[in-house]
Amino acid sequence: MDFSRNLYDIGEQLDSEDLASLKFLSLDYIPQRKQEPIKDALMLFQRLQEKRMLEESNLSFLKELLFRINRLDLLITYLNTRKEEMERELQTPGRAQISAYRVMLYQISEEVSRSELRSFKFLLQEEISKCKLDDDMNLLDIFIEMEKRVILGEGKLDILKRVCAQINKSL
């Protein structure tokens, strides 16, 4: 298996939404300010290699990222890993490299509809100024902004819980 070639092929198949998701899930390893210049998957892979989170001999973080964003096609085709293998692997204590907190936020963002996103922005106006909540901002961007303002974190879920409860109890 040609490591660089596989990374290139994977990167070519990831769209901007996939990239935004991968960047969000990598925030615990690559801080936001270091992510700003990342414009494509290859740049992200390069940063992950610099952090030793992605190596030819250790693809577990990349596999977990692709699994979390539900790109099972890439997992199977390029990394020869099935969904069941990943589920088993991530059940083992200490194996998951992406925090449960980050995964939870990502899952919420995947479940929120457009109208619920508008409600989210409306309900957060007091905490985040309107100009920061522009129209093209997605929920992952909002979570990042909330983290910057220290109103969201692993131990700070009150505002998120309140807003989710107001919008949709199933969140």
Tell me what each language-model feature is.
Residues 1-3:
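Plant-biased recognition of short, low-complexity, intrinsically disordered N-terminal tails
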Residues 6-10, 21-171:
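Alpha-helical death-domain superfamily interaction modules
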